[in-house]
Regions:
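A short, small-residue-rich loop immediately preceding and capping a beta-strand
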Residues: 46-60, 75-80
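General beta-strand structural signal in soluble alpha/beta enzymes
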Residues: 1-3, 23-24, 51, 130, ...
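Short acidic, glycine/serine/threonine-rich loops at helix termini
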Residues: 9-15, 35, 62-65, 87-92
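Short gly/pro/ser/thr-enriched loop/turn and capping motifs at secondary-structure boundaries
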Residues: 29-31, 58-59, 83-87
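Active-site diphosphate/adenylate-binding microenvironment
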Residues: 1-41
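Thiamine diphosphate
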Residues: 71-157
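Short acidic loop-to-helix transition motifs that present clustered carboxylates
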Residues: 6-7, 59, 133-137
Length: 157
């Protein structure tokens, strides 16, 4: 789980999960979610792995999507596409960097160019879809849970 700024609802529902069901970012960096999902899928091939991930952090280790396809791992990646390094904006505030200029703020914005996670995943040979509504996400997620193999769902935030 590397959904640092989008995953709070998920965390609130994991209190009763069995041990080692939720592997999370422990702080200090971003980008480990996709490789962590690979490790979980290799360690427990009989269990489906769901990897909730922010779009900014996923860009750090995007090549992991290729490994998921190459090894035919049963991983569903859910990308929260908020088009921002949102956690880094929060960290700027935490350290008192008030009034960051437009250039600094633009470095944390993921709009220029905009990442299209469906096309990125397809480029690695991975099935992918985009959800723009809750209903679309539920349908795509249900479909992913009923099938084996790697898949990516881009959720537009």
């Amino acid at each position: 789980d590397e959904s640092a700024t989008s995953g709070l609802p998920l965390l609130m529902n994991l209190g009763r999960a069995r041990p080692h069901t939720h592997l999370a970012l422990t702080g200090g960096s971003i980008g480990l979610g996709l490789p962590l999902a690979i490790g979980a899928a290799i360690a427990a091939p009989d269990r489906k792995v769901v990897c909730p991930h922010g779009d900014g952090g996923a860009a750090y280790t995007v090549q992991a999507l290729w490994t998921m396809v190459r090894e035919n791992l049963d991983i569903t990646v859910v990308i929260y596409a908020n088009r921002s390094y949102a956690i880094l904006n929060i960290e700027l505030q935490r350290v008192g960097a008030i009034g960051a200029g437009p250039k600094a703020l633009s470095m944390l914005d993921l709009h220029k160019p905009e990442m299209n996670w469906v096309q990125i995943a397809n480029g690695f040979g991975m099935e992918a879809s985009r959800a723009t509504t809750c209903e679309e996400f539920v349908a795509q997620y249900d479909s992913a849970m009923k099938s084996r193999g790697p898949r990516l769902i881009e959720v537009m935030c």
